[in-house]
């Protein structure tokens, strides 16, 4: 396989096992570089395997049905892989204070569903960076953390 195909296989496994319907935290040790950067607009940046595992553990405790899935084929060029996705979940778990725009009290029952595009950089077979551009405004509005846009 080419470098790009190898990198797409790594990212495909990451999306399925880390962001999919169930989370296998062991995939962090298998695929993430020791100092991997995970950065999305809704949350503070995470650095390193332990920080990334702690983030996902808290996210899935607050949103037990959390899952994301690919919305298009992965695109690869050199060390980079780009994926378009959608997903979300229902806040039925404990209070969640990881959003940059506020805290959810325990079990609000609010649902979020949103989309995004993620760029991942692969270095020597490990994910060095995952930087996502997401529709965080939609998610925060659905969760009641910011006002919904007025409709005409």
Where are the regions a protein language model picked out?
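C-terminal and inter-domain tail/linker signature
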Residues: 1-152
């Amino acid at each position: 396989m080419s470098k790009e195909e190898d990198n797409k296989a790594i990212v495909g496994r990451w999306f399925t096992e880390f962001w999919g319907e169930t989370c296998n935290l062991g995939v962090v040790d298998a695929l993430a570089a020791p100092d991997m950067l995970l950065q999305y607009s809704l949350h503070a940046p995470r650095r390193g395997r332990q920080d990334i595992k702690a983030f996902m553990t808290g996210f899935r405790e607050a949103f037990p049905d959390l899952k994301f899935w690919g919305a298009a084929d992965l695109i690869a060029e050199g060390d980079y892989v780009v994926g378009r996705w959608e997903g979300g979940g229902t806040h039925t778990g404990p209070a969640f204070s990881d959003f940059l725009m506020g805290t959810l009290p325990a079990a609000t029952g609010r649902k979020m569903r949103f989309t995004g595009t993620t760029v991942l950089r692969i270095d020597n077979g490990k994910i060095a960076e995952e930087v996502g551009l997401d529709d965080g405004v939609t998610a925060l509005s659905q969760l009641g953390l910011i006002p919904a846009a007025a409709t005409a």
